[in-house]
């Protein structure tokens, strides 16, 4: 039943996005996001990582309104581990102070799996399918401080992996801190609860980002620390460094 509801939510968002696109033909497309390389690919749920260097791409495609299509790809350099998802997102509330976003996505997770046949064992890349929904309220204090929460509910579509995932994250954000004439520092301490089927845990996580007013290149440090957990595969402390290229372009359709 939960999988069915998640699918219907994804479908309804997709239909609304298509309808919005048809009603917004005069508005330019906005393409934004970042491309990065990292020493350790960390998942959207930072409990888990690829434990090797990876390529990251997160982006958004919209026409400046409430709907957006947001791809998120995280893969090792050989393409054998990682994941890919396409978010369909809608801003229920989009005001100066308070924002409330909802979203849903289909996703694939790629992992190595040992297979034995005729006495021989080798590793294959297994693709697992998921459908997830999200709720993301946030409140902006000023140009530098904001607070928010994030809830993700994921449903696995196979029996040999996670079936039900609940991720609840409480977020603080401090941005635009000047470091000299051209550089800016942002940091975001967070605490979250994660439940995967019958296992659960509490964690500290966050990131520190260094940007420049004169360059699209940025450097991000991300960390994840256990508070209390019994989740299989969790590490007491995990981290990564990511070198990112940020972009934000507008394109107008020519008839």
Task: Label each region the model flagged.
Residues 25-36, 48-51, 74-174, 181, ...:
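Outer-membrane pore/translocation modules
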Residues 39-41, 70-71, 116-120, 188-191:
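Extracytoplasmic loops and strand-loop junctions of Gram-negative outer membrane beta-barrel proteins
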Residues 58-64, 68:
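Surface-exposed extracellular loop regions of Gram-negative outer-membrane beta-barrel proteins
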Residues 56, 72-73:
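N-terminal Sec/ER secretory leader and immediately downstream segment
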Residues 186-222:
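Glycine/small-residue-rich hydrophobic helix-like segments
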Residues 13, 50-54:
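Short secondary-structure boundary/capping elements
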Residues 1-29, 243, 247:
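Bacterial Sec-dependent N-terminal signal peptides
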């Amino acid at each position: 039943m939960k999988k069915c509801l998640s699918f219907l939510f994804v479908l309804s968002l997709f239909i609304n996005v298509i309808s919005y696109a048809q009603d917004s033909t005069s508005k330019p497309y906005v393409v934004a996001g970042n491309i990065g390389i990292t020493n350790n690919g960390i998942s959207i749920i930072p409990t888990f990582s690829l434990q090797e260097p990876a390529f990251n791409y997160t982006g958004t495609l919209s026409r400046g309104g409430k709907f957006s299509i947001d791809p998120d790809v995280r893969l090792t350099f050989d393409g054998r581990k990682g994941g890919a998802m396409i978010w369909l997102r809608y801003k229920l509330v989009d005001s100066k102070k308070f924002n409330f976003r909802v979203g849903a996505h289909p996703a694939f997770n790629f992992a190595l799996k040992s297979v034995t046949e005729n006495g021989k064992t080798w590793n294959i890349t297994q693709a697992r399918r998921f459908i997830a929904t999200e709720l993301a309220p946030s409140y902006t204090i000023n140009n530098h401080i904001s607070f928010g929460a994030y809830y993700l509910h994921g449903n696995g579509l196979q029996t040999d992996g996670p079936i039900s995932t609940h991720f609840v994250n409480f977020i603080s954000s401090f941005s635009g801190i000047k470091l000299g004439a051209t550089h800016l520092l942002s940091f975001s301490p967070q605490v979250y609860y994660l439940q995967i089927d019958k296992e659960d845990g509490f964690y500290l996580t966050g990131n520190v980002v260094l940007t420049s007013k004169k360059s699209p290149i940025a450097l991000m440090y991300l960390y994840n620390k256990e508070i209390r957990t019994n989740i299989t595969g969790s590490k007491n402390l995990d981290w990564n460094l990511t070198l990112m290229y940020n972009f934000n372009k507008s394109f107008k359709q020519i008839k």
